[in-house]
Amino acid sequence: MKKILFAAILSAFSCAAALAAGDWANFGRYAEANKAVSKPPLAVLMGDSITDAWPKKTPGDFFAKNNIVGRGISGQVTSQMLARFRRDVLDLKPKYVAILAGTNDIAQNQGYIAVENIFGNIVSMVEIAKANGVIPIVCSVLPANNPWRQEIKPAPLVKKLNEMLKAYYGKNAVKYVDYYTPMADDKDGLPKKYANDGIHPTPEGYAVMEKILLPALK
């Protein structure tokens, strides 16, 4: 366990070291918002554009009503989230962190990365959360079957990553939230009612996700 934690912390430190020439992990995005957090949130949602857009599209003020803080950044991959995990999650002292990540890694936003390494970055965030008294919730990646580039076939990669995450939760007593199963269509993608572009949820899609997530925050 100590070796795993050391590797996770070393990985995060290495990512931070890469920021010397610029704000690669976008620490600045939530710098002021983090200062304005006056009490520990029930949960922080860590993620990419799916999480980033959630507060703007959610009906009924889901975030404020449940003391949830969103820390998604559009376009980010798991290594960037790992680099800013302390600043945007641990420093806020939440009870829970829900990690929804991996779509942009599969899309190769920062270049090719094996599914095993995407999984490893997510596990590193989980281990760091646990070591700091924050309860991690691993979220399945949402369905995706529209290729960003012709050579990328996302559907089988999403399914493989989700299988790895589900197996990890089963062996490590970590909470797991399955968005994939109730939202996937018969082509392993998101139907139009849940995502007009096949990736980013509609208000109806977010409403489904909220009903799935809330029971895990108990």
Predicted regions and their residues:
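Serine-esterase "nucleophile elbow" of acetyl-processing enzymes
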Residues: 19-96
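Cell-envelope and extracellular/periplasmic
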Residues: 71-74, 101-106, 110
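Active-site segments of SGNH/GDSL-like serine hydrolases
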Residues: 100-106, 125-158
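Charged, glycine-enriched surface loops/patches
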Residues: 115-139, 168-174
